[in-house]
Regions:
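Structured mid-domain segments that build the active-site/substrate or prosthetic-cofactor binding neighborhood
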Residues: 1-85
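Acidic, low-complexity N-terminal propeptides/linkers enriched in Ser/Thr/Asp/Gly that mediate export
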Residues: 13, 52-190
């Protein structure tokens, strides 16, 4: 029995569809498996070389789905020249996470800063609850702009999604500009 789509794949994705009647818990991957399925769908008669290339595929689906939204929230009139340079690099990035590129580091540091700010309530309450995963966080940011937990509780202002995108972007650029001299190589000099 061959599947209708012409291939089988497994990459820690959800093991059932939405018709499964019983509860189960687990942390299932939401990006790599979709990337693998996408590549397999567009390949026609995949060769061993195609499969080797797929194993080394480093396209960031998280970045592809999330970065355009994050960038759309940046108020570039408030940025300094260094921040504008990083913003431009992020706008032109193809979502490939090659080790010799700086842009993936910018994105993942920005994402890390954004997670800290978005889910600050979890850290402040010393709760044992886990923060929502990247997939859920990305969905909330893109689809629930007034979600209560987006607000930074330690400030008097009620922050918006746009605010936390801008704050976390500036935190990221500050991080890279303040790396100790000995930690910088020539590529990290601004």
């Amino acid at each position: 029995l061959n599947p209708l789509r012409g291939f089988c794949s497994s990459a820690n994705q959800h093991p059932t569809d939405n018709t499964y009647p019983y509860y189960y818990s687990g942390d299932y991957e939401k990006y790599r498996n979709r990337r693998i399925n996408y590549v397999l769908e567009i390949l026609n008669k995949a060769t061993p070389k195609d499969m080797q290339t797929l194993q080394n595929d480093n396209f960031s689906l998280l970045a592809a789905e999330t970065l355009p939204f994050l960038l759309s929230n940046i108020v570039d009139s408030t940025l300094n020249p260094q921040q504008k340079k990083i913003l431009s690099e992020l706008k032109n990035w193809n979502f490939i996470t090659d080790f010799n590129l700086k842009t993936p580091s910018y994105f993942y540091k920005w994402w890390s800063e954004l997670l800290k700010i978005t889910w600050d309530e979890f850290a402040q309450n010393n709760t044992t609850m886990r923060i929502p995963d990247d997939f859920q966080t990305s969905w909330i940011l893109r689809n629930e702009p007034n979600f209560e937990l987006i607000d930074i509780k330690k400030t008097p202002k009620i922050e918006t999604t746009s605010d936390i995108c801008n704050i976390s972007f500036k935190n990221m650029t500050d991080y890279f500009s303040q790396l100790p001299k000995e930690a910088k190589n020539a590529d990290w000099q601004f």
